[in-house]
Amino acid sequence: MANFSGTIEDREEIRDLYARYADTLDNHRYNEWLDLFTDDGSFESTRFGKHEGRAGLEKFTRVYRDSLGGAQARHVITNLLFTIDGDAADASCYLLYSHCKEGRVQQSTVANYRDKLRRVDGRWRYQSRKVCMDGRA
């Protein structure tokens, strides 16, 4: 997948989308996280299953929050690549994930996100996001 497509503005907006994804999840701003997805957006992972549409994504935020058990999560996104075709884009990146509680790392995971993005009302959003686990770090 080449990452040299689209305008500079598109490229920066997509990078910002990825940063906001991590920031909103890690800081428990789930309503803002939901707004990063299209109305028919989906999220899928081995651990949490597949969640589709606004109601499904809202359910995911509750399940995810409860899974933390008070721990602080950190999503570190790297190696972002994407190809833009008009108002759609295919993208992938690496995820380094950890969560800590009482000063100790309780979980550390390495994964790959595979995404379909769509521009809606002038903003890039996730149409679908799939988490592909590499294993435990």
Each language-model region and where it sits:
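Short, low-complexity N-terminal intrinsically disordered segments enriched in polar/charged residues
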Residues: 1-27, 31-35
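Short helix-to-loop capping/linker segments positioned immediately adjacent to catalytic or ligand/cofactor-binding
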Residues: 5, 22-23, 67-70, 102
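Short, conserved clusters of charged catalytic residues that mark active-site
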Residues: 16-17, 77, 112
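A solvent-exposed, acidic/Ser-Thr-rich amphipathic alpha-helical stretch
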Residues: 30-95
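Outer-membrane beta-barrel domain signature
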Residues: 37, 43, 100, 136-137
